[in-house]
């Protein structure tokens, strides 16, 4: 008599799938959850970490009996990458990004040693031990996830197609985007998930570095300005240029806004005769890169490409013998910000204070105050210091500490018809302006305390529409649908007593002149006492020969897209000259 045993087919288990998901999600989503709960960023990081961590289920589905081995091998890689990212966040309060790689590769050996030594603090060791213990515990709970054939292949392909192949096919073949741009977009989505933050970060870093190197080489090949003269003498001096972000003057009490959003600058304006407030300066482009390609060079709306063929303001100051510094709280190395990094690398020394993965992450401009003080103490006889702020960049609530929301819930002086979400944004923007006021005033005060021979100029790169213009439904910036608030900017000049003594000038008759930020390099040259072939005193807002011209706005690369700023409606609103 023969007995036969029929081996039962293993069954699919939701519990086993749940543990597998939890295991792979743990390595990426924990950090993203901490970032979100801390209020430093939104939910996109959590979403993308959950989605792209799920790719590791594919080998688990295909080879269920080997789940422990597969999970261990993959887990070691995920553990190392995610632990490094977690420790970086604990130490620096920032998410790992390609900007971090840029700064790391630009760092000298001593600085790198200081950086690495921080990882071996007791706090980091305890975090690493706890993190490892949880990872091992989750690994011990793993069980095979059996999906019957051929469904395991279908499910695995569906995961791969939905997360990788479909976005590539849609963007490349349907939307006709360049394949390189498609990969960049996919890499950005994958970045929150371990170990992709390192792989995509390095890929993006290399892409931007190649572009950066090319632009810098082209800039270095430019001939110097001809017939160059510095008429300011040989005395030691320090000149400061502070670049703000997304700050429109119509929301500053300094310019008549009824809410007290700039109390420190208001006080300085009342007590310090050397602070001049210009009332009628507008930007030409409502986007950071595009306007700085004009404001920091000889380019303008009619000649937008001159930034490629003529020296920049930074080149000019180095030609005049200045040691140049760039302190920035903007992102360092991204596809969008490559030109900013090019400008910064045209200076002698850079301080990159913001390594966040996204611009819409919580970061405060007080970051710049310490390096600013350090540079003020630099012994160089002639110094140019450029400080680039995040200002009031969206998301506005991430530009100031959570406990400093002075205008939260305030309905005074609010446009009619705003819903709760719009009111929150409106008040957040005023809170951001209040914090920006503190930073800008602190820079002026710190500069003044150094007893310098020089001057400081502050302007915002562009404005921001935050439900200001009727019918009060627009927020942000749109060059194709412009409002005055997108272009109206603060423009301040502070001169030291020493500078005023040797360069006596009265700017009181200049403050209401109509001026475009695109012509800044001529005003800066005038203030600094520089002349050369191409300098035009009629384009300097502080020169007696100044001539008002049409203030063009719009995209100069589009046919018939330029319009006269002064033809825009609602010029009677506060700050809308």
UniProtKB/Swiss-Prot annotation:
Question: Which pathway does the database say it acts in?
Answer: Bacterial outer membrane biogenesis; LPS core biosynthesis
GO biological process terms held by the UniProt record: lipopolysaccharide core region biosynthetic process
- Kindly give the membrane topology term recorded for this protein: Multi-pass membrane protein
Keyword Phosphoprotein part of the UniProt annotation = no
Its annotated compartments are: Cell inner membrane
Main location as per UniProt: membrane
**What GO cellular component term, any one, is given?**
plasma membrane
Gene3D superfamilies found in the cross-reference section: Alkaline Phosphatase, subunit A
Q: Which residues cross the membrane?
A: 17-37, 44-64, 69-89, 119-139, 154-174
EC top class, as a word: transferase
Q: Which UniProt keywords apply?
A: Cell inner membrane, Cell membrane, Lipid biosynthesis, Lipid metabolism, Lipopolysaccharide biosynthesis, Membrane, Transferase, Transmembrane, Transmembrane helix
Record EC number: 2.7.-.-
Query: GO molecular function: any one?
Result: phosphotransferase activity, phosphate group as acceptor
Please give the NCBIfam families that the UniProt record associates with this protein. CptA, PRK10649.1
Q: Which family does the record claim for this protein?
A: Belongs to the phosphoethanolamine transferase family. EptC/CptA subfamily.
Subunit architecture: Forms a complex with an unidentified protein of approximately 36 kDa.
Q: What this chain does, per the record?
A: Catalyzes the addition of a phosphoethanolamine moiety to the outer membrane lipopolysaccharide core.
Q: What is this protein called?
A: Phosphoethanolamine transferase EptC
Organism of origin is: Escherichia coli (strain K12)
Lineage here is: Bacteria, Pseudomonadati, Pseudomonadota, Gammaproteobacteria, Enterobacterales
């Amino acid at each position: 008599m023969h007995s036969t045993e029929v081996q039962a087919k293993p069954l699919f288990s939701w519990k086993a799938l749940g543990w597998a998901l939890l295991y792979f999600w743990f390595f990426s989503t924990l950090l993203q959850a901490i970032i979100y709960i801390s209020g430093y960023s939104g939910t996109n990081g959590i979403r993308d970490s959950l989605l792209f961590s799920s790719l590791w289920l594919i080998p688990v589905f295909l080879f269920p009996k080997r789940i422990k081995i597969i999970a261990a091998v993959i887990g070691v890689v995920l553990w190392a990458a995610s632990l490094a990212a977690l420790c970086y966040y604990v130490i620096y309060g920032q998410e790992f990004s390609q900007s971090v790689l840029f700064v790391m590769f630009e760092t000298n050996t001593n600085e790198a040693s200081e950086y690495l030594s921080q990882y071996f603090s007791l706090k980091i060791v305890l975090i690493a031990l706890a993190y490892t213990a949880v990872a091992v515990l989750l690994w011990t709970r793993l069980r095979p996830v059996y999906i019957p054939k051929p469904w395991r292949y279908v499910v695995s392909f569906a995961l791969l197609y939905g997360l990788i192949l479909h976005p590539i096919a849609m963007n490349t073949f349907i939307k006709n985007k360049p394949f390189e741009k498609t990969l960049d977009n996919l890499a950005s989505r994958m970045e929150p998930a371990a170990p992709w933050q390192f792989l995509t970060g390095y890929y993006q870093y290399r892409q931007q570095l190649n572009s950066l190197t090319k632009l810098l080489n082209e800039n270095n090949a430019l001939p110097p300005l001809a017939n160059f003269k510095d008429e300011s003498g040989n005395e030691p001096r320090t000149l400061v240029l502070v670049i703000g972000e997304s700050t429109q003057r119509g929301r500053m009490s300094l310019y008549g806004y009824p809410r007290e959003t700039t109390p420190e600058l208001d006080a300085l304006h009342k007590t310090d005769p050397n602070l001049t407030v210009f009332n009628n300066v507008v930007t030409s482009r409502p986007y950071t890169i595009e306007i700085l390609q004009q404001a920091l060079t000889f380019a303008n709306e009619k000649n937008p490409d001159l930034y490629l063929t003529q020296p920049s303001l930074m080149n000019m100051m180095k030609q005049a013998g200045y040691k140049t510094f760039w302190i920035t709280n903007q992102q360092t190395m991204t596809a969008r910000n490559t030109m900013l990094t090019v400008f910064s690398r045209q200076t002698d020394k850079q301080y990159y204070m913001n390594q966040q993965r996204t611009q819409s992450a919580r970061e405060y401009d007080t970051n710049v105050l310490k390096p600013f003080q350090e540079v003020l103490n630099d012994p160089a006889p002639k110094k140019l210091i450029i400080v680039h702020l995040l200002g009031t960049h969206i998301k506005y609530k991430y530009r100031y500490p959570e406990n400093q929301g002075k205008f939260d819930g305030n309905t005074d002086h609010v446009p009619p018809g705003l819903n709760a979400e719009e009111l929150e944004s409106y008040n957040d923007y005023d809170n951001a302006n209040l914090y920006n006021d503190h930073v800008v005033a602190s820079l002026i005060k710190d500069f003044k305390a150094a007893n310098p021979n020089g001057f400081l100029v502050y302007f915002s790169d562009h404005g921001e529409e935050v439900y200001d213009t009727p019918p009060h439904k627009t927020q942000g910036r749109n060059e194709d649908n412009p409002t005055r608030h997108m272009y109206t900017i603060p423009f301040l000049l502070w001169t030291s007593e020493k500078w005023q003594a040797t360069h006596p000038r009265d700017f009181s008759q200049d403050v209401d002149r109509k001026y475009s930020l695109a012509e800044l390099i001529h005003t800066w040259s005038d203030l600094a006492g520089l002349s050369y072939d191409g300098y035009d005193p009629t384009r300097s807002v502080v020169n007696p020969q100044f001539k008002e011209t049409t203030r063009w706005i719009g995209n100069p690369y589009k046919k018939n897209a330029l319009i006269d700023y002064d033809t825009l409606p609602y010029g009677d609103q506060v700050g809308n000259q």
